[in-house]
Amino acid sequence: FLKEGIDLLIVSPNESEPITPVVEKVFNRGIPVIVIDRTINTDRYTAYIGGNNYEIGMEAGRYAAALLKGKGEILELKGLSGSSPAIARHAGFLKILEGYPGIRIVRSVAGDWNWNIARQVMTNLINTPLTYDLIFAHNDVMALEAYKVLRESVSPLDPFILGVDGLPGDEGGIQFVLDGRL
């Protein structure tokens, strides 16, 4: 696409690392680059439009600590391993939990932002002796699947479930909360 003489590059990277060299090459040629939703591993772009996922993780950590009253065990369903939101949300969450020695993450697994993968992970975990008081899912879709698996099982666990994004629409996090599913 560089040979076609583009005037502007707008990217919304799935993962941070793979697209970074291309963005740097385009930016170094004087072509403006706008990065949307997810960051990349360079500062060689013109503008970034998106949320502060580190702060989102910190806010989730604060809320988790309040729900658990400073003591409990957490299962974390992370997003795609190489994606900047998953990395930043995890880091922000951990930063807050450092101040709560009575709270620990007992398992942190990748759900890849995907309901089906989150369902598989939760189904596998439901048959283990692992216990947790709260599930922190990096997005609402994974949180909803965790909720569904727990309700469909005979598990005695009844953890708090936190999801992130709060998207609108029938299949968004806001509706999940309004329906009592989260």
Spans of features found by a protein language model:
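A residue-level marker of the well-folded mature domains of exported/periplasmic proteins
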Residues: 1-182
